[in-house]
From Swiss-Prot:
Keywords associated with the record: Cell cycle, Cell division, DNA-binding
Family: Belongs to the CedA family.
Domain of life (superkingdom): Bacteria
One family name in Pfam for this protein: CedA
InterPro entries per UniProt: CedA-like_sf, Cell_div_activator_CedA
Gene Ontology biological process terms, A to Z: cell division
UniProt keyword annotation of DNA-binding present: yes
Function: Activates the cell division inhibited by chromosomal DNA over-replication.
Protein name as catalogued: Cell division activator CedA
GO molecular function: DNA binding
Length: 80
């Protein structure tokens, strides 16, 4: 008889973006992209949602960060 898998009914923890007031002082704005900033050598997108900024996970390429920003913006337009 096989042992049952442990923790079958474990909740799925989904990624919740942190709400930040604004890109920090040391972030460098990338002119080529609408929402992308360079932060500690990684590319991070910040988008204004209502009164607060939403921050993306850190990406190694700026295109990914911008794609994330576009996607989140689209999702929020649909949600509203």
């Amino acid at each position: 008889m096989m042992k049952p898998l442990r923790q079958q009914n474990r909740p799925v923890i989904s990624y919740v973006p942190r709400v930040e007031p604004a890109p920090p002082e040391h972030a460098i704005k990338m002119d080529a992209f609408r929402d992308v900033w360079i932060l500690r050598g990684k590319y991070v997108a910040f988008i204004l949602m209502g009164e607060a900024f939403q921050r993306s996970p850190a990406f190694t390429v700026p295109e990914s960060a911008q794609r994330w920003a576009n996607q989140v913006r689209q999702e929020n337009e649909i949600a509203e």
